[in-house]
Amino acid sequence: MTAYTLADLAALVASRAGTDPATSYTAKLLSEGPAKAAKKLGEEAVEAAIAAVQGDKTGLRNEAADVLYHLVVLLWAGGVELDAVMAELERRTAQSGIAEKAARRPA
């Protein structure tokens, strides 16, 4: 198992955020605004879902990596820190999913 973490990925995105969009895909995505990052995340998520349904494990692995990368880019673009997302996941795992969903306020 690799030691590479989502925190490592977030640090990489942060380090490339202010670089030249002509030489960094991350900087290019960020320079085009959150809508572009959101669109790419959606595309990659659909591709991951298709790979899963087709039983394509290699495709699913590769598309899942793309989903995680584009999610971290979108979080950066939206000003949301990965630590905040992880804290929310930790909070949610402290109770059952059914109890957590029941405790949500109606939209």
UniProtKB/Swiss-Prot annotation:
Q: What class of enzyme is it?
A: hydrolase
> Which GO MF terms are attached to this record?
ATP binding; phosphoribosyl-ATP diphosphatase activity
**Family matches, as InterPro entries:** HisE, PRib-ATP_PPHydrolase-like
Example of a GO biological process term: L-histidine biosynthetic process
Q: What is its main location?
A: cytoplasm
- UniProt EC number: 3.6.1.31
Compartment(s): Cytoplasm
Residues spanning the signal sequence: none
Output the Gene Ontology cellular-component terms: cytoplasm
Instruction: Print the keywords alphabetically.
Output: Amino-acid biosynthesis, ATP-binding, Cytoplasm, Histidine biosynthesis, Hydrolase, Nucleotide-binding
What HAMAP family does the annotation carry?
HisE
PANTHER family (alphabetical): HISTIDINE BIOSYNTHESIS BIFUNCTIONAL PROTEIN, HISTIDINE BIOSYNTHESIS BIFUNCTIONAL PROTEIN HIS7
- Protein's UniProt name: Phosphoribosyl-ATP pyrophosphatase
Task: Write down the species.
Answer: Methylobacterium radiotolerans (strain ATCC 27329 / DSM 1819 / JCM 2831 / NBRC 15690 / NCIMB 10815 / 0-1)
Provide the gene name from the record. Answer: hisE
